Amino acid sequence: MSANDSPSGQQTTTSASLDAVRHATHDSAFLRACRREPVPHTPVWFMRQAGRSLPEYLKVREGIAMLDSCMMPELVAEITLQPVRRHKVDAAIYFSDIVVPLKAIGIDLDIKPGVGPVIAEPIRTRADLARLRDLTPEDVPYVTEAIGMLTAELGATPLIGFAGAPFTLASYLVEGGPSRNHERTKAMMYGDPQLWADLVDRLAEITGAFLKVQIEAGASAVQLFDSWVGALAPADYRRAVLPASAKVFDAVAPYGVPRIHFGVGTGELLGLMGEAGADVVGVDWRVPLNEAARRVGPGKALQGNLDPAVLFAPTPAVEEKTREVLDAAAGLEGHIFNLGHGVMPNMDPDALTRLVGYVHEQTAR
C-alpha cells in the first residue's frame, strides 16, 4: 500500500498526516474509553453539541440554509470547534446532517425548518432504487476539506465522524419526511421484504462509503445514528435491520477506529445493536447503564445517558442526576458520558459547560 492509499483503494489524505492525527489523539480519554482502557477521567461529549444552543452558532449560521452550511468547509470547521472551545468536551463531532450523503448522490431533498428532511420524490418501488447510486469522495469534497481543517485545529482532541443508519435513512426516503408511525416504511418491510432488504442494503453501501471518506480525512471514531429504529420490535430489527447496520460497521472495520451505535427508544434492542458490530453502544435515558450493560453483554463500552431535560433543572438537581448516571456506570468496562439524546435548542449552554466540569471533577482518577 502506497503512502496515499487507503483500505478502500482511494487516494486521500497522506498516511503520514493520518498517522500524526492518530498519534495525537490515541491516548485521549475518549478513545481510551472506547477501547475500554483506563482513563484519567470519564470523557464527555454531547450529541448536537454543535448547534442552536450556542449563540455563536446562531450568529455564523444566520441567513444560511442547513444543507448549504453542511457544504461550506470553513463554516463546518468553525461550528464543529465551537463546543470544544466553550465546553472543553473530550471529543468533537463533525457538523453535518444525516441526509447529506443522499443529497450528494442526487436525491432531491431539503431540510425545512421546524419539519426536518423532506424528500421530493420518495423511494417506494423497485424502479426507484436506481436513483440510489454509489457515493464517491468526489461527491463530498467539502467533507474531506473540512475534516482536514479540523484535525489541524483539534490537536489531541478526537473528531467523531457520523452518518445516519440504513433504517432511519430508509424511513425518510420511503415516508418522504419525518413520520410518527412509519406506516409506509413498515408496509414495505412487511409487504415486500425483498425490496426492503435491497433498499437498506443499498443504503448501507452509501453510508459505509460516507463514513470511509470521514475516516480517511482524519476522523478518529464514527457514530451511526439510528434515530427512528426504536419503532421496531426486536424480531423485526434482527430480520430487517441488523444485516444492513452490520454491513456498515463491517465496511469501516479495517480502519481500526472505534465504532459507536446509537438509537432512541432502543432499550429492548440494545443487545441486537451491539451484535451489529459496534465497539460502543449508545444508551438513551430510559435504561440505567448497569442494566444496559447486562443487555449488551461483555466486550462493549457504553455511552450515555443523562436525560437532556434534566439540564433545565437547578444545578443541584443536575448534579444529583449526573451522579446517578455515574454510579450506574461504575462497573462498566468503558464509559463515555453523554446525554441520552441530543442537546435541545433552548438549553442554557452554561449548564453544559458546568456539566462537563462536574463529570471531570467527580471522575478524576
From Swiss-Prot:
GO terms for cellular component: cytosol. GO terms for biological process: protoporphyrinogen IX biosynthetic process. Residues 1-17 have a biased composition (Polar residues). Pathway: Porphyrin-containing compound metabolism; protoporphyrin-IX biosynthesis; coproporphyrinogen-III from 5-aminolevulinate: step 4/4. Its EC number is 4.1.1.37. InterPro entries: UROD/MetE-like_sf, Uroporphyrinogen_deCO2ase_HemE, Uroporphyrinogen_deCOase. PROSITE patterns: UROD_1 (PS00906), UROD_2 (PS00907). Catalyzes the decarboxylation of four acetate groups of uroporphyrinogen-III to yield coproporphyrinogen-III. Homodimer. This is Uroporphyrinogen decarboxylase. It comes from Streptomyces griseus subsp. griseus (strain JCM 4626 / CBS 651.72 / NBRC 13350 / KCC S-0626 / ISP 5235).
